[in-house]
A protein has these predicted regions:
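A short beta-strand element within beta-rich, extracytoplasmic domains
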Residues: 35-51, 272-275
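C-terminal interaction-tip segments
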Residues: 51-73, 276-305
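N-terminal leader/pro-regions and domain N-caps
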Residues: 1-28, 303-304
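Short, hydrophobic/proline-enriched secondary-structure or compact coil segments at domain edges
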Residues: 265-281
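Solvent-exposed loop and beta-edge segments used for protein-protein assembly and interaction
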Residues: 32-39, 57-59, 266
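Low-complexity, serine/threonine/proline-enriched polar segments
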Residues: 80-226
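Intrinsically disordered, low-complexity segments enriched in Gly and acidic/Ser/Thr residues
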Residues: 199-261
Length: 305
C-alpha cells in the first residue's frame, strides 16, 4: 500500500512516482529486477475527504494512473540501453582478474522520465507503508539507478549519464532519454516516392478499363501517391521529446464516495506515475492499494522485457 498526502494543493495537480520493483524488493527482502513488465491486477484508492455526488467539488479527487507506453519502440529503446550498459561493464570486467567484482545486487534500472529522476528520494517518490502509515524501513539499503559513462573528447574527459525512458534528454545530457536516443540513431523510412519516372498515359494497355486518358492519369496518380508516406511521424518516435513525451494514462477516475476501484494494466519496468487533483486545502490522506497479478516471477506476474 502507498500513501499520498495532498495538504496545501487545492485545485492543483500533485504528481507522484512509484517503482513497483523497488517497493517489492523492500517489503519482500529480496531483489525484484526492474527489467520486467509488471502486471497490476487492480488498484483501489481511498480518501479522507471526498466530493458527494452532485456537489460542485465532484472533481476534488481526480486520479490519473499512467505508465511507459507498452510498444515495440519502448521495448527496443530499453533493450538498447540495457545492452549498452551491460556490454560496457563486461568489457571493463574482462580487463580485471578480480573475481566477484560486480556488486551482489547489480541490476539495470531506469527512471520513467526526467522529472522522476529529479524527484527521487523526495516526498514525490512513493514507498510502501503499513496500515498505520509507517513507511518501509530503508536503513542500510542501496537502490541505485543505472548510469553510463561516455567520452566527451579525445583528451579523456568523461561524462556520466542517468537514464530515463520518456521525453527529452536532460540539460547537458545529465540523463539520456532512451526512446529519444533510440530514434536519433535508427534509420528511418523514406517519405518520397520510390520513382519519379514519367508515365505515358496514352499507352493502350494502361488505358484498359479506363474511360479516357484523364481517368487513367487520375487513377494512376492515386495508386502512386495515396498512402505513399507512412501513417506515422517519420522522424519522431512516440515517447521522445516531440511526439507524446508524457506517460500513457491507463486508468483514471474520481474519488467521489471515499473509494475508487480501478482495473488492471501492465507497467513496463514497474514504473508508474500518479496524478491527483484535490479541492481541499486541509491535508487529505489518499491511500493506494496496488494488487499485483500472481505469477512465476517471485510470486508475481512480471514477464522479462
Amino acid at each position: 500500500m502507498y500513501q499520498i498526502n495532498t495538504a496545501g494543493s487545492a485545485g492543483t495537480q500533485k504528481t507522484k512516482f512509484l517503482d513497483l520493483a523497488k517497493g517489492l524488493s523492500f517489503v519482500n527482502r529480496r531483489l525484484y529486477r526492474q527489467g520486467r513488465n509488471y502486471r497490476v491486477r487492480r488498484i483501489n484508492f481511498t480518501a479522507n475527504y471526498f466530493a458527494e455526488p452532485g456537489n460542485a467539488d465532484r472533481v476534488a479527487n481526480r486520479v490519473n494512473v499512467s505508465v511507459v507506453p507498452p510498444s515495440w519502440v519502448a521495448t527496443n529503446a530499453w533493450r538498447r540501453g540495457f545492452e549498452t550498459w551491460m556490454n560496457h561493464r563486461k568489457d571493463l570486467l574482462k580487463q580485471t582478474d578480480t573475481g566477484g567484482l560486480e556488486a551482489a545486487y547489480a541490476d539495470f534500472k531506469v527512471y520513467l522520465n526526467n522529472q522522476h529522476r529529479t524527484d527521487e528520494g523526495s516526498t514525490f517518490d512513493l514507498m510502501p507503508v503499513d496500515q498505520s502509515g509507517n513507511t518501509v524501513n530503508q536503513t542500510g539499503s542501496n537502490w541505485k539507478y543505472s548510469e553510463v559513462v561516455s567520452e566527451v573528447n579525445a583528451g579523456g574527459s568523461n561524462k556520466t549519464h542517468d537514464l530515463h525512458m520518456l521525453g527529452d534528454h536532460a540539460t547537458n545530457n545529465d540523463s539520456v532519454g532512451l526512446i529519444k536516443s533510440y530514434g536519433e540513431t535508427r534509420a528511418t523510412v523514406r517519405s518520397d516516392m520510390p520513382g519519379d519516372q514519367a508515365v505515358d498515359n496514352n499507352d493502350p494497355l494502361l488505358r484498359v478499363g479506363a474511360t479516357n486518358q484523364n481517368e487513367a492519369a487520375t487513377v494512376l496518380g492515386d495508386i502512386r501517391g495515396n498512402n505513399q508516406s507512412p501513417p506515422y511521424a517519420i522522424d519522431n518516435y512516440p515517447g521522445d521529446d516531440a511526439n507524446m513525451p508524457g506517460s500513457l494514462v491507463v486508468q483514471q477516475g474520481v474519488i467521489d464516495t471515499g473509494d475508487l476501484p480501478l482495473g488492471g494494466f501492465v507497467a513496463m519496468c514497474g514504473l508508474m506515475r500518479i496524478d491527483i487533483t484535490t479541492a481541499y486545502e486541509t491535508e487529505n490522506t489518499i491511500r493506494m492499494l496496488v494488487e499485483l497479478a500472481p505469477g512465476n516471477y517471485r510470486g508475481v506476474d512480471a514477464e522479462a522485457i
